[in-house]
Amino acid sequence: MAERRRHKKRIQEVGEPSKEEKAVAKYLRFNCPTKSTNMMGHRVDYFIASKAVECLLDSKWAKAKKGEDALFTTRESVVDYCNRLLKKQFFHRALKVMKMKYDKDVKKEKDKGKSESGKEDDKKSKKESVKEEKTKKEKEKKKDGEKEDSKKEETPGTPKKKETKKKFKLEPHDDQVFLDGNEVFVWIYDPVHIKTFVMGLILVIAVIAATLFPLWPAEMRVGVYYLSVGAGCFVASILLLAIARCILFLIIWLITGGRHHFWFLPNLTADVGFIDSFRPLYTHEYKGPKADLKKDEKSETKKQQKSDSEEKSDSEKKEDEEGKGAPADHGPEGSGGERHSDTDSDRREDDRSQHSSGNGNDFEMITKEELEQQTDGDCDEEDDDKDGEVPKSAHEKS
């Protein structure tokens, strides 16, 4: 009784809200984003102060009219006005408190952690060696799986990942002051929205019209009858489709031994729109040994390609090193002419062997340029031989 008297005294001291204040509070109630939660065992709606300030700054009261100044010009003016609304019991300030686990649950978890830690240490030593071998295979499979999953559409049986949110509760704040920021305020003012009023009025009219069904004209009664039958058939057909698609999936799954997963109208029971529930027409997945073998073959081919590329790079490096070391193994500078002639003769012989091997005959196909080179080389050799014989004969004569 004493609390009620105090509450009445506060209302009398503050005074009743004006029409303008009611209009501002109503606009804020239906346009400011709100969330619902539990407070003291009751379901309440709350809003954040910063969003309320932004909402009022975008309202019609923030724009100046002809002959009148704007009610809200800055954030500070909005905060002052919201303090007036708070004092007139349109909303009140609340404190957000995070929910904590009970001490018993914490102790149980600690005891379980100690008992499991000893067992896990033994298992870890055994599993580490096995995991190292599996990690390489799993990484390759994940890459292939991610590519396939991106192409596939979501089936109705696949569970969606839920985002974990921290739970909290609201408690009344001791300091009832409106502050701009992330402060939480709970709504007390709860007017009836125009939409709810209109919907209620339509519902009342529909009930009265249904009770007067015998007084309707014959044509209207027949039309309503056919409409109701058509709506009932449509609902029944959707239910039958949902049952039939499950039966079809089970039949195909049993016949193929769980390898083929065929869904007719996979999004029929999904949380999507009316049109999206009828597309795609079907989805098919193959989950058998061949799919696993193909993945393994792909991974093996990739490994072989990598090893071949590494071997080629190593062989090329060796050839480059041999090519650099070859000129260091040659003789002195004085034998440069003889080496040049040897290399020329070797090249000619290689060219002849290539021509003969390419044609597959015993006859050698030689171009004009090669014939001229051979004749020039033979003439040079004969001249060298003659020059060598002349000094020998002169020496014998002496």
From Swiss-Prot:
For biological process, the GO terms are: post-translational protein targeting to endoplasmic reticulum membrane; post-translational protein targeting to membrane, translocation
Any one GO CC term of this protein is: endoplasmic reticulum membrane
Segments traversing the membrane: 197-217, 235-255
Question: Which keywords does the record carry?
Answer: Endoplasmic reticulum, Membrane, Phosphoprotein, Protein transport, Translocation, Transmembrane, Transmembrane helix, Transport
Q: Which residues carry this modification: Phosphoserine?
A: S335, S341, S353, S356
Q: Which Pfam families match?
A: Sec62
Phosphothreonine PTM sites in chain numbering: T158, T375
Q: Where is the composition biased (Acidic residues)?
A: 372-387
Q: What is its main location?
A: endoplasmic reticulum
- The UniProt annotation puts the region (Disordered) at 106-167, 289-398
Per UniProt, subcellular location reads as: Endoplasmic reticulum membrane
Which residues face the membrane's Lumenal side? 218-234
Cytoplasmic-side stretches of the chain, per the record, are 1-196, 256-398
Highest taxon in the source lineage: Eukaryota
The UniProt regions of compositional bias labelled Basic and acidic residues, in chain numbering, are: 106-155, 289-324, 330-354, 388-398
Disulfide links within the chain: none
User: Would I find Cell division among this entry's keywords?
Assistant: no
What membrane topology is annotated for this entry?
Multi-pass membrane protein
This molecule's function is given as: Mediates post-translational transport of precursor polypeptides across endoplasmic reticulum (ER). Proposed to act as a targeting receptor for small presecretory proteins containing short and apolar signal peptides. Targets and properly positions newly synthesized presecretory proteins into the SEC61 channel-forming translocon complex, triggering channel opening for polypeptide translocation to the ER lumen.
Family, per the entry? Belongs to the SEC62 family.
Subunit info here reads: The ER translocon complex that consists of channel-forming core components SEC61A1, SEC61B and SEC61G and different auxiliary components such as SEC62 and SEC63. Interacts with SEC61B.
- Output this protein's name: Translocation protein SEC62
- Name the source organism: Mus musculus (Mouse)
Upper lineage ranks? Eukaryota, Metazoa, Chordata, Craniata, Vertebrata
| Gene designation per UniProt | Sec62
